Design a protein with these regions (language model features):
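Low-complexity intrinsically disordered segments
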Residues: 26, 140, 274-287
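Auxiliary, metal-adjacent structural segments of Zn-dependent hydrolase domains
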Residues: 73-139, 149
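Metalloprotease/metallohydrolase-associated module, dominated by Zn2+-dependent proteases
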Residues: 113-122, 126-136, 148-150, 188-271
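Post-HEXXH active-site segment of zinc metalloproteases
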Residues: 136, 150-158, 170-198
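Charge-rich, solvent-exposed alpha-helical interaction surfaces
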Residues: 28, 35, 61, 104, ...
Length: 287
């Protein structure tokens, strides 16, 4: 969403969610984040965020982590295995690598780093044999970082961009509404092809995958193409899969009244941007 919508619009979305009914003046990002945390505590009270003292972005409080981890268990067949007995030493070691990825992200695009720090209030590590972490709409602003030892800092940075994007899409939907009837999203007749997994998935999951793939492609334009990526496919493969996802999603949209104008706006922006990327890739090949 950062590359789709821009820095100022990302801030605007957080402001509209958290401050639209506030009387006080919001004249700093820290004040905005404080109101954002209050908003999340009000609407997602099962995963409370501490408001006393300075909130540490890297969380090792196992009792708090357990409450968040429940929300990351997933639904259906894609349930991750989460090791709630992960030792503290493993958490601290993993989070030090996450910090290196976050530093790289900030170096590549400081504005993206600012949005990350505004939106993501909690990063935590728990081991998993079958997942690399994730985000959930049931606990916005959290990222489960089940990073792997063989990942480079570039891999970790891409993972953070990936999960930030999921969070930004969740906030955007909360603010503007994307769908006319969420109960129809998991109807198999409304499935669309994922850009990342390249399989048919529920409609909103496919849309998330498309926006994530777009953001990673745009991020790589600034960070460079990884020589041996472990988190996402090579860019040309991801671009091709993303264009297929666009057509798959449009096929559903054309045959239903499932989406709101905001959804169509984002889809149009992503499609235009992907075609621009396609032309730039073709130019590189020709040269």
């Amino acid at each position: 969403m950062f590359y789709v919508d821009g820095y100022e619009n990302c801030i605007k979305t957080v402001f509209l969610l958290a401050c639209s009914h506030q009387q006080q003046t919001i004249d700093s990002l820290q004040k905005l984040k404080n109101q954002y945390i209050c908003f999340l505590n009000k609407h997602f009270s099962e995963t409370p965020i501490p408001t006393h003292g300075n909130l540490e972005q890297f969380c090792v409080d196992i009792e708090r982590i357990k409450k968040i981890a429940v929300k990351h268990q997933g639904k259906g067949s894609r349930k991750p295995k989460i090791d709630l007995n992960t030792p503290l030493a493993s958490m601290e070691e993993a989070l030090s690598h996450v910090k290196n990825g976050q530093i790289l992200l900030n170096q590549v695009n400081p504005s993206l780093g600012t949005i990350f720090d505004l939106v993501i209030h909690t990063l935590f590590y728990l081991r998993s044999p079958n997942a690399r972490g994730g985000s959930t709409s049931d606990a916005p602003g959290t990222i489960w970082c089940a990073i792997k030892r063989h990942w480079t800092d570039m891999d970790t940075a891409e993972c953070l961009v990936h999960e930030l994007t999921h969070n930004l899409v969740v906030l955007d939907e909360l603010c503007y509404q994307h769908y006319t009837d969420r109960s129809q999203l998991s109807n198999k007749k409304n499935y669309a092809k994922s850009s990342i997994l390249k399989i048919e998935r529920p409609f909103d999951n496919a849309f998330h995958s498309l926006v994530v793939a777009h953001e990673i492609l745009r991020y790589r334009q600034e960070a460079g193409e990884p020589s041996n990526p472990h988190v996402h496919p090579p860019s040309e493969q991801m671009l091709s899969a993303s264009l297929e996802t666009v057509q798959s999603i449009k096929s559903v949209v054309d045959n239903t009244d499932l989406v709101q104008p905001r959804f169509s706006e984002i889809l149009g922006k992503v499609e235009t941007s992907l075609h621009q990327l396609e032309k730039s890739f073709q130019t590189v090949v020709v040269v």
